[in-house]
Amino acid sequence: ACLLSRGLGDVYKRQTLRGDVENIHIGEGSNIQDGSVLHTDPGYPLKVGKNVTVGHMVMLHGCTIGDNSLIGIGAVILNNAKIGKNCLIGAKALITENKEIPDNSLVIGSPGKVVREITEEEKKAIIENTKHYQDNWKRYSKSVF
C-alpha cells in the first residue's frame, strides 16, 4: 500500500510507487519527481519524511528518508538504509544496504560517503527547493482539478 500524507507537495508523472509487499509512506509536503521508482522488499518498508525532495530518476528501495532532505537526481538508496534529517544526497550517489547517514550530512559518490556537515545556507536552500515544488503543485492542481 502507498500511504500519502495529507498536504502532499506532489507526485509528478511517470514514476513508479510499488508498495506491493510492504508499505510506502510519503510525508506531508514531500515531492517525488519524474521517473523515480519507489519499491519495497519483504521486511523493508519505505518511508519518506516530511518536506523531502526526491529528484528525477531516483531509486528508493526499502529505505527511510528523514525530514527536510534532498535526494539528488539519479541517486540510489537501498534496503534498510537510513538517511537522517536535513541531508543532501548528491546526484548519482549510491547508498548501500544498511548504511546510516547522520542528520545534516552532505553525501556524494558511489558508494556514497559523508563528506561534511551541510551549512545553514544549504539547509535554507533545501527548504526553498521544497517550497518551490509545493508552490508548483498548488498552481498545477488549481489548473487541472
Task: Spell out what each predicted region is.
Residues A1-Y12:
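Single conserved hydrophobic/aromatic residue that forms the stacking wall/gate
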